[in-house]
């Protein structure tokens, strides 16, 4: 990968140090006061991680974002921001070109060498902890609230999430028949992977009170027609980038033809296919309670069709 010349990195670093130092000096002499608008205190942020971007926006700091990664698709307005590319393959030049003061990344962001060079350029790089539970989500909100110095907004968001989660638990307490789900992660029509255990998809199914029909392996992988027939899924949940949420009755031969074994399972009916936006189900951001509830209700409704 082509890298910036050291002089260019140092130039960006010096400029950002002057910006940060200027704010500190003004505050030290009492010029900055409580009447100063919040927007003027915000720093330039690059965010890497769709769920993290959603939290930042939910806290009211969308205007601070100057760049996002390819998984940051919500709210829709962030799609117009400059992209720094795929989270695991960040470009040093691409990030520095946006002159960020903070880069907030998820657990899988990298390469590590790029993050280290950003720190050398005096950019504050913070890695947000991972997790697919409500507690993990709340921890992320707290951490980001501290990074952005908006603890009050973070606490308000946490309170909202707790209220939504309590309502969700009441819904999940209503008994329902066991529904065996084949969860398909679809990136392109030619790249369809089925979710096993230790995946975000498996966590979502458990949250929604659904059963993963492919619990015999870990991660995401292709499966054979024989494996599908043996699993006997009742329902297929397919995630696609920017799909409508939710949509059932998928009518795509290019997708169905990849899973010929489905014709010998209860999931053969078109009404037993549910299509969701990938990041809606798998970002584990502030929309988590709503996504779980929608997945459960859509699954139960599809089984009645």
For every predicted segment, state its role.
Residues 1-13, 23:
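N-terminal secretory signal peptides
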């Amino acid at each position: 990968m082509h890298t910036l010349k050291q002089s260019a990195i140092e130039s960006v670093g010096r400029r950002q140090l002057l910006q940060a130092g200027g704010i500190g000096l003004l505050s030290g002499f009492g010029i900055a006061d409580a009447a100063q608008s919040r927007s003027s205190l915000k720093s330039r942020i690059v965010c890497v991680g769709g769920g993290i971007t959603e939290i930042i926006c939910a806290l009211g700091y969308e205007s601070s974002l100057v760049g996002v990664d390819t998984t940051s698709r919500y709210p829709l307005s962030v799609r117009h921001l400059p992209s720094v590319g795929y989270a695991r393959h960040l470009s040093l030049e691409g990030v520095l070109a946006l002159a960020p003061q903070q880069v907030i990344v998820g657990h899988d962001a990298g390469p590590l060498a790029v993050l280290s060079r950003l720190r050398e350029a005096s950019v504050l790089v913070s890695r947000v902890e991972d997790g697919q539970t409500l507690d993990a989500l709340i921890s992320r909100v707290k951490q980001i609230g501290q990074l952005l110095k908006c603890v009050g907004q973070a606490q308000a968001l946490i309170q909202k999430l707790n209220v939504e989660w309590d309502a969700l638990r009441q819904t999940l307490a209503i008994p329902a028949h066991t529904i065996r789900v084949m969860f398909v992660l679809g990136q392109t029509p030619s790249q369809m992977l089925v979710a096993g255990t230790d995946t975000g998809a498996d966590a979502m199914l458990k949250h929604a009170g659904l059963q993963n029909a492919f619990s015999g392996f870990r991660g995401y992988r292709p499966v054979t027609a024989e494996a599908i027939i043996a699993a006997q899924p009742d329902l297929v949940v397919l995630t696609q980038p920017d799909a409508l949420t939710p949509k059932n009755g998928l009518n795509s031969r290019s997708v169905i033809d990849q899973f010929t074994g489905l014709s010998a399972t209860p999931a053969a009916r078109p009404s037993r296919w549910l299509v969701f936006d990938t990041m809606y189900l798998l970002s584990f951001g502030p929309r988590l309670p709503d996504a779980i509830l929608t997945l459960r209700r859509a699954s139960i409704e599809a089984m009645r069709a």
